């Protein structure tokens, strides 16, 4: 073998090694914002917000204008992870100690059984018992809070007492005082995504923004100085999240992960009007009410899917859709087994790829407390 042949052969082997190192299935990052109003992204109609990274996600993906979550956090998250309407998922109100029934199959379990590494970074809020926690529901790794909210720096829950600390790594309580929760989320995402590039990952980033307590960066408080409160505080927190989204996308590109990673973005429910968020701040436009309500402003949420390699870019879909649809949609896009899959959701792939297709839903079901 001469030198030229050796170089060509070696180069071919190296190239083959690089190709083989790429996961056969796409990575997935499912981003769930918290109490994010129906229209509180520029591309969804807000006129006073700066959200360049969420807007870029829509420019490079498909944006849904008639998309639904649930009136409150736990109900929304249970339906998201099971692909089932609230009553069937087993949660019709916010979770306390008891939460998502362990016998329900979650999207994380489906991903894991098909060879994915799985992580939940951020907020669980589907029960505080360890035997029904994230590690028991399909997540290889969990870093975040088990309850509904914490102070973003101390990671204590301050409301009505007792003041409980809530920060966990898997089933071990940890402490990270003084470190901003969402910033720590991003560090954990970066570590998990790069631990093993030979296997695909599924990361559920349940970020707790713009949920109270409203603790935005000074940069954005200054930017929105002319907005009246509570809109100013809320808007600054939304833009704080937008910065972290931009940092995530920059990281994915730098690591060579962007092309093969599906990004899904959605809010859990409408904006809060609770006293802890100064009775408002969010924007639902023509849609009545907000969080805790069955009216449109409580359940209609912004939603985007972005995978430029395979899906349309800069397109809008007005078809009826719901968070339960992400389960079958991601299973189809990732080429996973659908055997014994028990979901109420419908794959959005036909609608995503062809805007002329009709919604597969005739009726959506919502349950929350005594509202249904």
PLM regions: where:
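Formylglycine-dependent sulfatase
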Residues: 2-14, 20-372
């Amino acid at each position: 073998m001469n030198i030229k042949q050796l170089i060509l052969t070696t180069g071919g082997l190296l190239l083959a090694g690089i190709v083989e190192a790429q996961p056969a299935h796409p990575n997935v990052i499912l981003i769930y914002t918290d109490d994010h109003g129906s229209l509180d992204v520029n591309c969804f109609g807000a006129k006073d917000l700066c959200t360049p990274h969420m807007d870029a996600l829509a420019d490079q993906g498909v944006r849904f204008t008639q998309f639904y979550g649930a009136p409150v956090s736990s109900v929304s998250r249970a339906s998201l992870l099971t692909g089932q309407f609230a009553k069937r998922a087993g949660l019709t109100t916010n979770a306390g100690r008891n939460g998502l029934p362990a016998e329900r199959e979650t999207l994380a379990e489906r991903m894991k059984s098909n060879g994915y590494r799985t992580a939940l970074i951020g907020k669980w809020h589907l029960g505080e018992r360890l035997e029904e926690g994230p590690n028991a529901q399909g997540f290889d790794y969990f870093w975040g809070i088990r309850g509904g909210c914490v102070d973003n720096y101390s990671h204590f829950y301050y409301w009505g007492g007792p003041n409980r600390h809530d920060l966990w790594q898997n089933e071990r309580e940890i402490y990270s005082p003084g470190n901003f929760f969402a910033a720590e989320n991003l560090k954990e995402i970066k570590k998990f995504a790069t631990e093993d590039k030979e296997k695909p990952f599924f990361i559920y980033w349940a970020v707790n923004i713009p949920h109270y307590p409203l603790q935005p960066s000074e940069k954005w408080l200054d930017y929105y100085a002319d907005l009246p409160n509570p809109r100013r505080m809320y808007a600054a927190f939304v833009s704080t999240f937008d910065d972290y989204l931009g940092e995530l996308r920059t990281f994915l590109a730098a690591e060579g992960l962007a092309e093969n990673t599906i990004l899904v973005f959605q809010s859990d429910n409408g904006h809060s009007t609770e006293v802890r968020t100064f009775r408002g701040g969010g924007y639902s436009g023509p849609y009545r009410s907000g969080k805790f309500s069955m009216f449109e402003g409580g359940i209609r949420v912004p939603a985007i899917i972005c995978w430029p390699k395979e899906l349309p870019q800069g397109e809008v879909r007005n078809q009826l859709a719901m968070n339960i649809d992400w389960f079958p949609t991601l299973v189809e896009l990732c080429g996973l087994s659908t055997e014994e899959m028990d979901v109420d959701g419908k794959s959005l792939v036909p609608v995503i790829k062809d805007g002329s297709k009709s919604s597969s839903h005739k009726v959506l079901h919502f349950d929350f407390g005594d509202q249904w």
